[in-house]
Amino acid sequence: MIQIDALPAFNDNYIWLLQDATSRRCAVVDPGDAKPVEAWLAAHPDWRLSDILVTHHHHDHVGGVAALKELTGARVLGPANEKIPARDLALEDGERVEVLGLVFEIFHVPGHTLGHIAYYHPAETPLLFCGDTLFAAGCGRLFEGTPAQMHHSLARLAALPANTRVYCTHEYTLSNLRFALAVEPDNAALRERFEEATRLRERDRITLPSEISLELSTNPFLRVSENSVKKKADQRSGQQNRTPEEVFAVLRAWKDQF
């Protein structure tokens, strides 16, 4: 049984910590800062960091990799098409890799960056570590990829089982939900989610992980085929957007300035 906890980093990052209590081994996802992981390891001296999983090359996701590799000798896994510090295993789309006894399938999900990958573990309750591609009620900015690429990546993730747990790496949920409400003010599920997320943050609790089912009902970037979302995108752009990709592009540009 793998336990998954969040180690907060910087202002709003989460480093996901996977723990196998039987073997006393652990793994981390996107350690942008080594210090939270080092502190956890110091408080758990009988545990060993065996693996470091990286989704993309941005500093707030890889800044702690080299130090943790030097400290622990952990294996570093990351996208083949990006420059990842101390990488031992370069991963391509469709490959499978075992971490703490869990087999993860690698998805290439370009958009936020061109080489971005996600780690998917199919199970009774599937797990998805998706970096800055799919957020709770949102998606990552397009620093390198195109709207069409990101739309395709998100559609791929949206097609995963509805109960897939979504582990993204930023606490952006409330700001994303505010934008989502601007897109779909009459979405009752969205209003309910906003109220629940507000209660969680008022108690300084995290809003993650999410689930694919929740994203499908409340994330505007996964709802670009819905009439309500298309209508708002058409109003925003002043023209008829004929494809889901065009609707997505309008929403993403709007969110960038929201």
Curated annotation (Swiss-Prot):
Chain positions recorded as Zn(2+) 1 binding sites: H56, H58, H112, D132
Cofactor(s) needed: Zn(2+)
Name of the protein described by the UniProt record: Hydroxyacylglutathione hydrolase
UniProt keyword Cytoplasm present: no
Family membership: Belongs to the metallo-beta-lactamase superfamily. Glyoxalase II family.
Entries under NCBIfam families matching the protein: GSH_gloB
Membrane-spanning ranges: none
Domain of life, source organism: Bacteria
Subunit description: Monomer.
Organism encoding this protein: Pseudomonas aeruginosa (strain ATCC 15692 / DSM 22644 / CIP 104116 / JCM 14847 / LMG 12228 / 1C / PRS 101 / PAO1)
Cofactor note: Binds 2 Zn(2+) ions per subunit.
Assigned keywords, A-Z: Hydrolase, Metal-binding, Zinc
Pathway: Secondary metabolite metabolism; methylglyoxal degradation; (R)-lactate from methylglyoxal: step 2/2
